[in-house]
Amino acid sequence: MKIFIDTANVEEIRKASKLGVLAGVTTNPSLIAKEGRDIKEVIEEICSIVDGPISAEVMALECDEMVREGRELAKIHKNIVIKIPMCEEGLKAVKVLASEGIRTNVTLIFSPLQALLAARAGASFVSPFLGRLDDIGNPGIEIVTQIAEMFALHGIDTEIISASVRNPMHVLDSAMAGSHIATIPYNVILQMVKHPLTDAGMKKFIEDYNKAFNK
């Protein structure tokens, strides 16, 4: 499973990139708004740091405007993937953009059937939201498992991006469920690095070394 980072904070992306694990980035209008910067400027900088799919979301809710915005975003860099919300107008926009060779990531997926429709419309990626489903008492990982099984059964090559990832267990569950990608906040990536026994082991190695060499 590939690891994306879910942020528009350039410094977080830069730090995570140095770990050597990032294969892509997902952003959304809310994340970019937090940065208080021009969307084009932020995306260009992100593309200069990570050489992989960079998801940038349209703001429009009607097909024609989604397509127009998508075309403009796609001009920024060859790695741009257009994030489109799951809705009727969104599916129409995905079909048009896909016919023009522009990759899309259909977001706000909360059911396997939504994922199927998005894939058949031509989406390159679908993003089921784990955390938000958990919030309403529906285990988010269940739809990731169902989507992965359905896509494998029918030979659908649309990639699954597990999104709304809240903790390391979401990442592990996604990997075991067959998700192709998990897009992860920076703080969760840092949690994945840590383990109490690793820290204790490192401390003991240093203590033993210092004791042996009288340091």
From Swiss-Prot:
InterPro entries for the chain: Aldolase_TIM, TAL/FSA, Transaldolase_3B, Transaldolase_3B/F6P_aldolase, Transaldolase_AS, TSA/FSA_arc/bac
Localisation: Cytoplasm
Superkingdom of source: Bacteria
Catalyzed reaction equations: D-sedoheptulose 7-phosphate + D-glyceraldehyde 3-phosphate = D-erythrose 4-phosphate + beta-D-fructose 6-phosphate
Active site: K83
Keywords attached to this entry: Cytoplasm, Pentose shunt, Schiff base, Transferase
GO molecular-function terms, A-Z: aldehyde-lyase activity; transaldolase activity
Enzyme class: transferase
GO CC term, one of those recorded: cytoplasm
Pathway where this protein functions: Carbohydrate degradation; pentose phosphate pathway; D-glyceraldehyde 3-phosphate and beta-D-fructose 6-phosphate from D-ribose 5-phosphate and D-xylulose 5-phosphate (non-oxidative stage): step 2/3
EC number(s) stated in the UniProt entry for this protein: 2.2.1.2
Keyword rRNA-binding belongs to the record: no
GO aspect biological process, one term: carbohydrate metabolic process
NCBIfam families tied to this protein: fsa_talC_mipB
Family: Belongs to the transaldolase family. Type 3B subfamily.
Stated role: Transaldolase is important for the balance of metabolites in the pentose-phosphate pathway.
Annotated protein name in UniProt: Probable transaldolase
Record organism: Clostridium perfringens (strain 13 / Type A)
Lineage: Bacteria, Bacillati, Bacillota, Clostridia, Eubacteriales
